[in-house]
Amino acid sequence: MDAWSILLQNKTDKHKIYSLHEPHVSCISKGKAHKPFEFGSKLSISRTRDSGIILGALALPGNPYDGHTVQAALKQIKRIIGKQPEILIADRGYKGQKEFGKTRLLTPSVPQKTDSQYDQRKQRNRFHKRAGLEATISHLKQHFRMGKCYLKGESGYQINVILAAAAYNLRQWIRLR
């Protein structure tokens, strides 16, 4: 990476450099009105439904489509807990493939007419629990130093994510005791 390659970048170039200090940073389109683009790396956070313990935390290089990150997250969960989960609840960004081996991927959708009231309530409760993950991510950013990474490179970012998840789990463990 030299100064001329940065200066000669065009608007439509694929692999642009957005930061001199962190060249692995990519542009992520969020679609928010006040901030349509963010610069950084994508994360994949997996946690349990009831206790809120983080089972997997991955920093993903580039800007991959959410649906393509499920395999890596499932592989990490299986390595950590020894078995693959039966149900994975995700947001609407994970549309596409619904089955990953023994794991079923559920995303929010309009209930079907054939669903009973019980099934509809069960689905609604599942997705309300999934929405709690946003609070977990917010806590990781504010209280566990994931808002800004002070370690260099992609490996430094991965280390930062894992350490933040470990610190969060320690706090949860202390609260559960």
What are these regions (language model features)?
Residues 1-86, 92, 99:
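Polybasic low-complexity intrinsically disordered regions
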Residues 172:
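Acidic, carboxylate-rich catalytic segments that either coordinate divalent cations
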Residues 175-176:
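Charged, often Cys/His-bearing segments associated with DNA-binding zinc-finger transcription factors
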